[in-house]
């Protein structure tokens, strides 16, 4: 697929894809994914052609932008590393996010409370999101998937070749897809305007790591505040010399004795 010159992969985006390890595929190759292999390293790892990855991102974004109602796009991720990414993608594009376990019958059983009728489904991994793809095939819903070299392509209409197992790779692909959708819709005015959202927002973060960082920051603040509090409350044990006669003030004991009881 050839793209117009304005849609070409920029050097900055190419560096992002390489920095996020999007180009590192699996050692096994499924027959339909062979066109996306750039070459194979001596250790057996297949290098993905990031030019093909970018072409599929642009194609997928045009498909998403062509749907009038953004809520009719369902984004799914059973894989832990992709759940934060799909939630952020849904927040920025208006899609419907299904993060975590996909409940069987979401697309086919209209009796369930979670029943949905999307016009397009996007999944993070065809293996972990196999149930969503299977139900989409029953009701003729097109599917866009992030596929590694060993991912099955059955019932997948548009495959975005990438490393769909690394947290940085998954987050970066969803970020690029969201940015391209906003460009296609005209929310980002032109292709030279930078998007204010950073790719880091789409990366998976370990809850325990977040709590640990928060605890360390709180501990650091306490250690900084402790010396200041000690300096404020330090008592020297000295009293000011006051001349009661000159000031016109009398000690409390003399006042009590002079008063009329």
Swiss-Prot record:
GO terms for molecular function: structural constituent of ribosome. It holds the Pfam family Ribosomal_S2. Its main location: cytoplasm. Residues 222-244 have a biased composition (Acidic residues). One of its GO terms (cellular component) is cytosolic small ribosomal subunit. Gene3D superfamilies: Glucose-6-phosphate isomerase like protein, domain 1 (3.40.50.10490). The modification N-acetylserine is found at residue 2. Belongs to the universal ribosomal protein uS2 family. Component of the small ribosomal subunit. Mature ribosomes consist of a small (40S) and a large (60S) subunit. The 40S subunit contains about 33 different proteins and 1 molecule of RNA (18S). The 60S subunit contains about 49 different proteins and 3 molecules of RNA (25S, 5.8S and 5S). Interacts with RPS21. This is Small ribosomal subunit protein uS2. The lineage of its organism: Eukaryota, Fungi, Dikarya, Ascomycota, Saccharomycotina. The gene is RPS0.
């Amino acid at each position: 697929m050839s793209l117009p010159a304005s849609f070409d992969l920029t050097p900055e985006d190419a560096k992002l894809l390489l920095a996020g390890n999007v180009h590192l595929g699996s050692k096994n190759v499924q027959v339909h994914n062979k066109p996306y292999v750039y070459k194979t390293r001596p250790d057996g790892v297949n290098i993905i052609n990031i030019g093909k990855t970018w072409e599929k991102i642009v194609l997928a974004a045009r498909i998403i932008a062509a749907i009038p109602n953004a809520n009719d796009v369902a984004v799914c991720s059973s894989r832990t590393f992709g759940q934060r990414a799909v939630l952020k993608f849904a927040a920025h594009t208006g899609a419907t996010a299904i993060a975590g376990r996909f409940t069987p019958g979401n697309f086919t059983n209209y009796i369930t409370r979670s029943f949905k009728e999307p016009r397009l489904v996007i999944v993070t991994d065809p293996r972990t999101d196999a149930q969503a793809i299977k139900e989409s095939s029953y009701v003729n819903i097109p599917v866009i998937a992030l596929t590694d070299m060993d991912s099955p392509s059955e019932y997948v209409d548009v495959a975005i070749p990438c490393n769909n197992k690394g947290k940085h790779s998954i987050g970066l692909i969803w970020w690029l897809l969201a940015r391209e959708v906003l460009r296609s819709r005209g929310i980002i005015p032109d292709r030279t305007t930078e998007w204010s959202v950073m790719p880091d927002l789409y990366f998976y973060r370990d809850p325990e790591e977040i709590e640990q960082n928060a605890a360390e920051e709180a501990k650091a603040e306490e250690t900084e505040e402790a010396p200041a509090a000690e300096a404020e409350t330090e008592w020297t044990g000295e009293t000011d010399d006051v001349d009661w006669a000159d000031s016109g003030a009398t000690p409390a004991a003399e006042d009590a004795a002079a008063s009329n009881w």
